[in-house]
Structures are given as C-alpha cells and as structure tokens.
Amino acid sequence: YDSFVINELRGYCALSSGDNGTAIRAYETNLGSQYASNKGARVKALMQLHYNNRNYPRAIEYGRQAQKGGFADGDVNTLLAQSYYQQGDFKATRAFTADLISQAERRGQAPRQNYLQLNLNSCIKLKDTACETAGFEKLVTYYPNPEGWASLMQSMLKGGPDVTLLNSFRLASEVGALSRGSDYTELAQLALERGLPGEAASVMETAFARKVFTEQRDIDRNTRLLNSAKSRIAADKAGLAAADRAAAAGASAEDDLRVAQAYMSYGQHAQAVVAAERAVKKGNGKTPGEAQLVLGLAQFKAGNKPAAVKAFKAVKGDPSLERVAKLWSLRAQ
C-alpha cells in the first residue's frame, strides 16, 4: 500500500511540474494495483498522457484496452482515431471512423463532427477521390457550414458531362462556393451553350460585382463574354412566350427544359415550374433525370422547398446527376 501511495504522489507532482514521462511511469505502475480504483478513468488518463507525449502506439494500446473493458466513450474514440491518424495509419483511421459514423447513424444520431473530419482527412491522405467526395457529403449533411460546402463543391467542379457540371456550378454559386474567376467564366459559358443568355449575364455581373477578375486580360475577356450574353437577352425574352407555346405543343422534353431554365434565369419561377413539369411528363430528355432536376431547381427558386426536395430525390438514371441532385436536396432541406 505504501508503494501505491508513493506512486500516486509521484505521479501527481510530476504532472504538476509538466514531467509527463515520470507521471506515466508512476501511474502505469499503479494501474494493476489492488488499491487502484476506477480503472477506466486511469486507462483514459494514461491514453491522454501518451498522446500528449506523441507516443501514439501506446495511446492506441490504451484506447483498445478501454474498448475491451467497455469504458470507451466518445472522447476515447476520438483520441484513438486521432492517434491512428497522427501515427500515419490512414487506412486504420478511415476504417475506425467509418464504423463510428455508421454506429451513430444506425442509432438515428448525428455522428460527431471530429469523426467525420478525421474520416475525410484520411480519404484525402489516401488520395481516394470517391471517399473524399462522400466524406464532404457527410459533413454538409450533418454540419452544413459554408466552409464544408465550399470544399465539397470544389471537389465536384473537376469535369464531367456538361449537364452535371452546369448544375454543380449552379449549386456552388447558390452556396457561395465559387471562389475563382475561372469558375464564374465556365458557368457563364455553360449557360450560353445551353441557350441561356439571361443566366450567363447574371453570373458575369455577379463576378464583376465581386471583383474576382484582377488581371486586365481576364477583365477584357470576361467583359466580352458579358456583352455577348447581354446582346442576346432582348431577343431571348421577346421570343420566350412563343418558345413556350411551341414547346408545350411539341413532343420533345428538351424544348421544355430550355424554356424552363430560361424562365428561371429571368426570375419567372412559376412559369419555369410549369415547363419543367411538362418535360418530366414527356420523359424523353437526352439526359436521364435532368427534367426532375430542373423541376427541383424551379420549385426551389419558387420557394416551394418540400416540392423541390421531392423532385431532387426523384432524379434517377445518371449517377453523376443523382449525386448533384442529392446535394441540391440537402441544400433545399
């Protein structure tokens, strides 16, 4: 008993003076003592001390001991995941945090943010793009802050079919995640290619208002793009009602989709909903799921978020577009 008391005092004094090494030796000596009460708290304290000393293998040993003993709480699990990560074992970090995330979801709870962040960081270290994107999606699902959205959207703006890219850029614009001048330029060009000068002009006006172009050559080039879009707006607006009637009478969903998006670009969201609903009903668009996605956008812009979520969730047939629709659904909720 005397040795136990001496080690307790030695450990306390060592901790008070910042001598973690001596404290660890004293408390480890006492861990198996018959006089040591509250073993769970002692194991957790030793785990923390080893972590603070950057002895991650030993911290992991105590973390696993806590798990086997049934006294691993959220703080222990977080420290164990951090120990795996700091040790450079990113596969173990990813697997461990993925399990913790799944457990929380099965209980109907939001996973801890640090579990999600460590899982995402591991995916990035492992250069697993699919895992990285899924990690960002989880973050914005449970903790939808601007930084998470910005990181997610930058991972989405790396190519793909034009329809997917256009709607990814639209979402990035919606959440304030367009950070580079080239992002605005590409969104405007994609809109123009789809016959949407109103949207293209609006995008470029926002870009200039935010002063995202700093080089004179970029300013000149994008001024020409803005002027090109503006020069088409008058004719586009003048012919929109006739185009709407022709699309309604025709058999092609593509015409309805163009009209719906044109109406949206001019703030006429009720008309956009009607045209998009026609496209959905016809069901013969070139890209599977695009009509439902455009309908969701129109409903979202019209302020009918429940209808927008329903439409986004109905997007099927194109995996890349389904992913974008899922993110739009998260935004609309």
Where are these regions (language model features)?
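C-terminal soluble interaction/assembly domains
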Residues: 251-333
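Residue at a conserved register position within TPR or TPR-like alpha-solenoid repeats
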Residues: 14, 50, 84, 123, ...
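Alpha-helical repeat scaffolds
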Residues: 20-31, 56-68, 91-104, 127-141, ...
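Structural motif corresponding to the intra-repeat A-B loop/turn of tetratricopeptide repeats
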Residues: 17, 53, 87, 126-127, ...
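TPR-adjacent "capping" and linker segments in tetratricopeptide-repeat scaffold/adaptor proteins
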Residues: 35, 172-179, 229-253, 284
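Long, contiguous interaction/recruitment modules in multidomain scaffold/adaptor proteins
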Residues: 180-183, 189-237
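Generic helix N-cap/helix-start motif at coil->alpha-helix transitions
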Residues: 1-7, 34-45, 58, 69-79, ...
